[in-house]
């Protein structure tokens, strides 16, 4: 079983967007996928409720937010959307389950500083647990100074940058229908699929 955890201590950085897209990718590969939502806002769970029956199936993993247990048997791929403020013992408990951790980061100096200590803590715990960590830049406009600052910060961490995802209405419009870029005709989302390619390769590796 492959367990992917999406984590960042700050709210509003794109954790649910990334979680649902990753689940959608696994489902499009015809894996038995469960999406767990440990966040108080339950955005991923809401997204699942909007997902049409005609789309690749993704099952909801019902979680006790205070006690994250192992996923049910028969599942091949699990994606866990975690709450803001994740650290300490709770972070360690989550990482006991995880094979890979994906950290979304936005090109904002406030987000960067808020995430710095978390990445240091995460790297120490993950090294002991032999968990892989990857960073994804979210809502990035490559032409801006903020994007340059994000790139410089990420490079300084020594952690791998999987990709930079652009700021596009595609994610918002698809989320409103319970869908992902992997559920629609490729020609509609060519640029986005191109940005997802290195993430998908890392997830499959």
Explain the meaning of each model-derived region:
Residues 35, 80, 103, 135-137:
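Structural beta-sheet core signal
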Residues 2-13, 20, 24-96, 175-183:
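P-loop/Walker-type NTP enzyme "switch/lid" segment
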Residues 141, 151-182:
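Beta-strand-loop-alpha "switch" segments that mediate conformational coupling across diverse proteins
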Residues 181-205:
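NTP-binding/hydrolysis catalytic cores, primarily Walker-type P-loop NTPases
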Residues 113-130, 138:
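Conserved C-terminal guanine-recognition region of P-loop GTPase G domains, centered on the G4
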Residues 98-117, 141-143:
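Conserved Switch II/interswitch segment of TRAFAC-class P-loop GTPases
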Residues 32-33, 78, 132-133, 161-162:
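Hydrophobic anchor at the start of a short beta-strand
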């Amino acid at each position: 079983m492959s367990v992917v955890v999406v984590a960042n201590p700050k709210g509003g950085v794109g954790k649910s967007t990334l979680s649902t897209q990753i689940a959608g990718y696994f489902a499009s590969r015809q894996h038995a996928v469960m999406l767990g939502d440990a966040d108080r806002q339950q955005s991923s769970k809401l997204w699942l409720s909007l997902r049409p029956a005609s789309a690749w199936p993704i099952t909801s993993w019902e979680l006790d937010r205070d006690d994250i247990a192992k996923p049910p048997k028969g599942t091949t791929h699990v994606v866990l959307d975690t709450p803001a403020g994740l650290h300490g013992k709770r972070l360690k408990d989550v990482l006991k389950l995880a094979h890979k951790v994906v950290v979304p980061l936005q090109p904002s100096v406030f987000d960067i500083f808020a995430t710095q200590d978390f990445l240091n803590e995460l790297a120490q715990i993950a090294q002991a647990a032999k968990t892989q960590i990857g960073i994804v830049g979210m809502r990035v406009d490559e032409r801006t100074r903020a994007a340059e600052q994000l790139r410089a910060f990420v490079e300084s961490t020594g952690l791998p940058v999987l990709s930079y995802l652009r700021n596009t209405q595609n994610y918002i419009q698809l989320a409103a229908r319970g869908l992902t870029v992997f559920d629609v005709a490729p020609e509609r989302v060519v640029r986005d699929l191109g940005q997802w390619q290195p993430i998908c390769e890392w997830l499959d590796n």
